[in-house]
Amino acid sequence: MAAGEVLRPAFLETLSLVAGDGNLRTDPADCWPYGYDNSRRHVPAQAVVFATGHAQVLGVVRLCTRHGVALTARGRGTGTCGGSVPLRGGVVLSLERMDRILEIQPADRLMVVETGATNQAVQDAAARHGFFWPPDPSSAAYCTVGGNLAFNSAGPRAVKYGTPRENTLGLRAVTGAGEELRTGVRTSKGVVGLDLTRLLIGSEGMLAIITEATLKLTPRAPCKRTLRAIYADVDAAARAVISIMAQPVIPCALEFMDDAAIDMIRVYSQADLPEHAGALLMIEVDGDDDYIDHAADALARAAKVDGLIAIERARDETQVAALWATRKALSPALRNVAPGKINEDVVVPVSRLAELVNGLRSLSSTHGIGIVNFGHAGNGNIHVNLLLDPRDSSQVRAAERCLDEVFGLVLALGGTLSGEHGVGLSKRDFVARELDPVALRLMRDIKRTFDPNGILNPGKGWPDEFNPPGGN
């Protein structure tokens, strides 16, 4: 069917049978909320199916591929790159009702879940057995495991514990061709065949729809220490990050904020910050009781570089909350200042962090666009926020030019365009600047193998010329 074409009554009748009673919506008012995500992009879906199990997903995919109808999987819509926006209309398949914890095996250190379960529900279930699942995006209370897997979204703990790719043992999925697929193992070792688990994680719903995941659990550390270090400028903070990451003790969080972020927090919150703060690091370490203070001392020593203004160590949970309040105040402040901001999540080698942030400051001045930078410094993963009024066409054009140069700077520093937000719609036209033609051709071939009719999340991930036809 052509993009925007109304779904035929016969198709909708069959779709209703496959979905089951109460699981299909076609009224435009009901479908409207399922046409957007946190990127603020919106394209209306023509139908929304609320899947309640793997069999329904299989039936919906087979029906859509038989009729050439675009199909976009969706969790809770917390993504920031338009990845769950149904660009070509068709059907949105919501997995939010597939939220069961199917199995927990402490001895095997694994948990099997449906992918509509929220990250927080997984953490709560694991905690009852003394474990956790390391990925911890800031939207953990709302985002789903399926979304975490689709974009390989991690969070602060990734610096020590890794991303979903390192913390997922296996998957159950349905390919775009309507074939059922199980990948991976239930063991800590396994090398039979190609690693399709890691291929599907981060594929943004373009190859298959993941219905179940076998998650690798990690024991919860009994103790944690939190430090906040404040520096005169970004260069000093970057030197501290390099110093911290070059010594043996690995922090479980190493978060960065630049002077623009600090100034914003100072205006919009009651956080206690020195007047001349030019950059800030939040440093956290976890471990056993007989190790934790030694580890915190080692990180504090590494953080003491020229340009350090002050370093504080929390002595109890109240002080921990007070130190983290600085970081948590940033997102509300950004929403107050620039509700139309562009939010990117670039990554550079840790050793190039100062060059990145100084380069961003230069681009901000050149284009007259405010830029606020913060993020996961231990990975070199910085959230670059371009502040603009979307109603001002001159600001929009300036921001577009600035963003183009931001991506150029990142690639010149040996970085990548996205660490955890994904490509989706927002970065698809830049992908060919990072990936070479051979890689793109192989990816297109893989897409055709998994999704020969091109129905799954069409128009995403890479420029249109690299997308196979179909899903219209």
Where are these regions (language model features)?
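N-terminal accessory segments
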Residues: 1-36, 67-69, 302-320, 412-417, ...
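N-terminal flexible segment immediately upstream of the FAD-binding catalytic core
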Residues: 1-62, 79-109, 138, 261-270, ...
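Conserved, mostly hydrophobic/aromatic
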Residues: 64, 205, 384, 451
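C-terminal substrate-recognition/cap domain of FAD-linked oxidoreductases
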Residues: 25-28, 32-34, 215-219, 225-402, ...
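Activity-critical C-terminal alpha-helical subdomain
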Residues: 179, 428-472
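Short beta-alpha connecting loops at secondary-structure transitions
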Residues: 106-109, 391, 425-432
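FAD-binding subdomain of flavoenzyme oxidoreductases
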Residues: 100-104, 110-255, 456, 472
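Short acidic/histidine-rich active-site segments
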Residues: 376, 416-423, 458-461
